[in-house]
From Swiss-Prot:
Reactions catalysed, as given in the entry: guanosine 3'-diphosphate 5'-triphosphate + H2O = guanosine 3',5'-bis(diphosphate) + phosphate + H(+)
Pfam families: Ppx-GppA, Ppx-GppA_III
GO BP field: guanosine pentaphosphate catabolic process; guanosine tetraphosphate biosynthetic process; nucleobase-containing small molecule interconversion
Chain's role: Catalyzes the conversion of pppGpp to ppGpp. Guanosine pentaphosphate (pppGpp) is a cytoplasmic signaling molecule which together with ppGpp controls the 'stringent response', an adaptive process that allows bacteria to respond to amino acid starvation, resulting in the coordinated regulation of numerous cellular activities.
Protein name: Guanosine-5'-triphosphate,3'-diphosphate pyrophosphatase
Gene3D superfamilies on file: 3.30.420.40, Exopolyphosphatase. Domain 2, Hypothetical protein af1432
Record's keyword terms, sorted: Hydrolase
Transmembrane stretches, start-end: none
HAMAP family from the UniProt entry: GppA
Gene of this entry: gppA
Pathway: Purine metabolism; ppGpp biosynthesis; ppGpp from GTP: step 2/2
Family recorded in the similarity comment: Belongs to the GppA/Ppx family. GppA subfamily.
Listed EC numbers: 3.6.1.40
Sample GO molecular function, one term: guanosine-5'-triphosphate,3'-diphosphate diphosphatase activity
Length: 494
């Protein structure tokens, strides 16, 4: 571990869980060293007078004693501890905070709902790829934050008094997962949302990002069940029906839902359905970071980059000493191929971005060894922290790199869920051809080519006489033609 002065810690005393994040700054980004999360369920200790019970406070202090051990290594000026909704509400919050500060040896700041929303947005802006005009949704234990913004700037932010713990106690107190309880929870959530919905819709968004445990749980369920990672209202309604079918909270079993998340899953699901319905959200993806990341980046005073993915790719290229000129050369050829076939194949812009990203990293496996370089590349990409890329996108990149040469493993292309299997196959074909035609590692030796698609048939036209003048190239293309034919990818080269 580096010198202690390079370490930063962010602690979030949430209504459901307490979290600690310890990082160090690396090349304009952060490297995570420690993440500790403990379910404290502080909000469950609030009574009708908003008094926090002694038992709930003791659970919180016990957790902070664990955190305090790690904080001894970090300068106090590089630690931020914030408390959110439950400690905003609790009339005896001062008692809890006084002892918490004594345990941690540093100040604990109770932040407003608006400040919490702003920090969540900053965490998302620093760690999440895609369009920069976004709506961010975070459902915590006792509050829900909704923020619109562009780039680093928020345009509207709201903190609403509803959360997965408070809605659990209010609408699922009998642990019954019947339609009536869901209807009541959703109706109440929609009433809370209605006063702010118009302003949020007025500011608008191109992408919607979820930054909470509920959204994380949904992502895990979808990955476990082989669905794509995009959260839609249809999928939420299907999961609600599955929960209703289970009958009771203690009997809730859904593939991919952990026991730890199950208790507050139905209440969080009801709130999320209300948000989708009231704001007419088409699709949501998981954020790369939220409140804790916002705190850390705030301490580091790092500017928000417009393109998180580009920063990530640059950092990885430097770290693994990838030949950047060659990566760019392959990317240029792949982009040219993509642009020629995108209309026939009905490819989306995100597919182009992911293909170019695969090109930028395709030689990363050489940093381990030439032998089995594609396998090494796939392993590294699957396991590296790649801010800006979702888990499913990381899996797709790893799968493309695994299949960049040699016989194609079709099943691996079908097991990823970032894009439809057919699109993954098409991106793989373009990547393989781009690598072949940039293999001489000189711009002036990349031939002028046209690529046409007719359904699955690819027709590649080279300059006249090129195959005769390049016998090794001709042999490599013949081998590639054979490998593609094994998986029924027709390729004609003229």
């Amino acid at each position: 571990m580096g010198s202690t002065s390079s370490l930063y810690a962010a602690i979030d005393l949430g209504s459901n869980s307490f979290h600690m994040l310890v990082v160090r700054e690396v090349a304009g980004s952060i490297q995570t060293l420690t993440r500790i999360k403990r379910k404290v369920r502080l909000a469950a200790g609030l009574n009708s007078e908003n008094d926090l019970s002694n038992e709930a406070m003791e659970r919180g202090w016990q957790c902070l004693r664990l955190f305090a051990e790690r904080l001894q290594d970090i300068p106090p000026s590089q630690i931020r501890v914030v408390a959110t909704a439950t400690l905003r509400l609790a009339v005896n919050a001062g008692d809890f905070i006084a002892k918490a500060q004594e345990i941690l040896g540093c100040p604990v700041q109770v932040i407003s709902g608006e400040e919490e929303a702003r920090l969540i947005y900053q965490g998302v802006a620093h760690t999440t790829g895609g369009a920069d005009q976004r709506l961010v949704v975070d459902i915590s234990g006792a509050s829900t934050e909704l923020v619109t913004g562009t780039g680093a700037q928020t345009t509207s932010l709201f903190s609403l008094s509803m959360g997965c713990v408070t809605w659990l106690e209010r609408y699922f107190a009998d642990r019954n997962l019947g339609q009536e309880n869901f209807d009541a929870a959703e109706k109440a959530a929609r009433e809370v949302l209605r006063p702010v919905a118009d302003e949020l819709r007025y500011h608008g968004w191109k992408v919607c990002v979820g930054a909470s445990g509920t959204v994380q749980a949904l992502q895990e369920i979808m990955m476990a069940q082989g669905m794509d990672e995009r959260i839609t209202l249809e999928k939420l309604q299907q999961l609600k029906q599955r929960a209703i079918h289970c009958g009771r909270l203690e009997e809730l079993e859904i593939d991919g839902l952990t026991l730890e998340r199950a208790l507050v899953f139905p209440s969080g699901l009801a709130i999320l359905i209300a948000i989708f319905t009231e704001l007419n959200i088409q699709c949501m993806t998981l954020a790369g970071g939220a409140l804790r990341e916002g705190l850390v980046y705030g301490m580091l005073h790092l500017a928000v980059e417009q393109d998180i993915r580009s920063r990530t790719l640059r950092n990885i290229q430097r770290r693994f000493m990838i030949d950047i000129d060659q990566a760019q050369r392959v990317a240029k050829v792949a982009a040219n191929f993509f642009d020629q076939v995108e209309n026939e194949w009905h490819l989306e812009a995100i597919s182009r971005d992911l293909l170019i990203s695969a090109c930028q990293l395709h030689e990363i496996g050489l940093s381990v060894d030439f032998k089995q370089a594609p396998q090494h590349a796939a392993y590294l990409v699957r396991n590296l922290d790649l801010p800006g890329f979702t888990p499913a996108q990381k899996k797709l990149l790893a799968t493309l790199l695994l299949n960049q040469t040699n016989p194609v493993d079709l099943s691996s292309l079908h097991q990823q869920n970032a894009v439809p299997p057919r699109v993954a196959e098409q991106l793989c074909r373009l990547l393989r051809l781009a690598i072949i035609f940039a293999s001489r590692r000189r711009d002036d030796l990349v031939p002028e080519m046209t690529l046409q698609a007719n359904h699955e048939l690819l027709t590649l036209t080279l300059p006249q006489g090129w195959l005769t003048q390049h016998p090794l190239g001709k042999e490599i293309i013949a081998q590639e033609n054979q490998w593609q034919s094994y998986v029924h990818w027709p390729l004609e080269v003229h």
